[in-house]
């Protein structure tokens, strides 16, 4: 239990500083929830073990770390929304309009900055915009992949015997790719 407590404490204190005061662009919006949940689970386990052993000093340390993790948890949707891979300038502008403040997500922007701006009050709106941006991003990726598929398809127009007409070679592959992409496009939901 000592190793868990000290490793979790050391890692959390470093990570907490980076999360609040480090560049927001360094935070991975996709991993943040799992990371915070892992910290919470580890420190809860250590807290339970030291409570059972009656080691008050270690319990106190675990409680301090637990408090820090608990305090951070409500910020996760805000971080996920603003650090979504799909966030584009138009989304930031939309958010800026909604809250009546200019937001600039550059290297100088930190979670502390977001908190000072009062963005925690808009966490739900930010999460929705982030979710929309994420869906748009998935569609962008799918469209790029579809375009790439077409680059590999060659169509040839061949003379058909001596009739003066032509036939299309590669038609079967073309229709197969087209059918797959139509199905994929219909499955995309926004």
Model-derived features with residue positions:
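Extended alpha-helical scaffold segments
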Residues: 1-190
